[in-house]
Amino acid sequence: MKHLLSISDLSKDEIVGLLDEADRFKEVLEGREVKKLPTLRGRTIFTLFYENSTRTRSSFETAGKWMSADVINISASSSSVKKGESLKDTGLTLSAIGADAIIMRHPASGAAQQLAQFVAPGGNGPSVINAGDGSHQHPTQALLDALTIRQRTGRIEGLKVVIVGDCLHSRVVRSNVDLLSTLGAEVVLVAPPTLLPIGVENWPVRFSYDMDAEIADADVVMMLRVQQERMQGGFFPSHREYATLYGMSKEREARLKDSAIIMHPGPMLRGMEINFQVADAPRTAVLQQVSNGVHMRMAILFALVAGSDATI
């Protein structure tokens, strides 16, 4: 595996292998006062973010540093991108400096694929990891979500996973649908008609407008943020109506199965898609998702950058 651009880049065995590797990193680091491994010593990793990020960027940086890599952060707002430099020239510059991997977030769907073609023609050059491209894909988020589900429930195959919210603009939902369906979960999308993707009837999912009917027997309920920054018009009448119909209220949380878990890729809009208290409830796995993000991204960097003879 040279790049990680989309969940479709991975076979089922490769997905399971990354989940297992992330669990191994967690086990190795647990209880260590100094969280440092020599695995990527001498490697140089650039994070190149054209959009804001807290969880993804900081967890990739932490993952690289815990593996002894040199991690250099590039923000579009403070780089030559601000002067009009193209994605191609930015990528080639980082490659010429000596990048072993470039982790990129970009507002344009397909940008990660383009960058990989620019910097690694014929497979020679740095690895590219997609940290989110427009509303297209966010493969590392789907992998850490799957890791969290497996840790909480012991399995993924046969589970009913209900994803609620802005499915139209979400790159997270696309990656999760690809991954969870590959691993044998039943995936149901719940959203108002205006926030379901075009062509969703061809996806390996069911879709519904009725949240209460679908979450009653769900094993996992994943709430999505309403991405107002990607909306040009009115997709629903009001925030209050949206919260009433599609928010995870205390009443809805109380009606879930005892074993059901609640997830959210973040950032959360408390009081809109999820109740303030529900966000902190024991069955809510949000902070576990965040901590798993570091271990999963360590596993990804290990697979792409460390080399075939490397050991943890």
Curated annotation (Swiss-Prot):
InterPro entries, A to Z: Asp/Orn_carbamoyltranf_P-bd, Asp/Orn_carbamoylTrfase, Asp/Orn_carbamoylTrfase_sf, Asp_carbamoyltransf, Asp_carbamoyltransf_Asp/Orn-bd
Residues annotated to bind L-aspartate: K83, R171, R225
GO terms for cellular component: cytosol
PROSITE patterns registered for this protein in UniProt: CARBAMOYLTRANSFERASE
Keywords, sorted A to Z: Pyrimidine biosynthesis, Transferase
Pathways per UniProt: Pyrimidine metabolism; UMP biosynthesis via de novo pathway; (S)-dihydroorotate from bicarbonate: step 2/3
Catalytic activity: carbamoyl phosphate + L-aspartate = N-carbamoyl-L-aspartate + phosphate + H(+)
Broad enzyme group: transferase
EC assignment: 2.1.3.2
GO biological process, one term: amino acid metabolic process
Binding site residues for carbamoyl phosphate: R55, T56, R105, H138, Q141, G266, P267
Single annotated GO MF: amino acid binding
Domain of life where this protein originates: Bacteria
Quaternary organization: Heterododecamer (2C3:3R2) of six catalytic PyrB chains organized as two trimers (C3), and six regulatory PyrI chains organized as three dimers (R2).
Summary of the function given for this chain in its UniProt record: Catalyzes the condensation of carbamoyl phosphate and aspartate to form carbamoyl aspartate and inorganic phosphate, the committed step in the de novo pyrimidine nucleotide biosynthesis pathway.
UniProt similarity note: Belongs to the aspartate/ornithine carbamoyltransferase superfamily. ATCase family.
Protein name as it appears in the record: Aspartate carbamoyltransferase catalytic subunit
The species this protein was found in: Corynebacterium glutamicum (strain ATCC 13032 / DSM 20300 / JCM 1318 / BCRC 11384 / CCUG 27702 / LMG 3730 / NBRC 12168 / NCIMB 10025 / NRRL B-2784 / 534)
Lineage of origin: Bacteria, Bacillati, Actinomycetota, Actinomycetes, Mycobacteriales
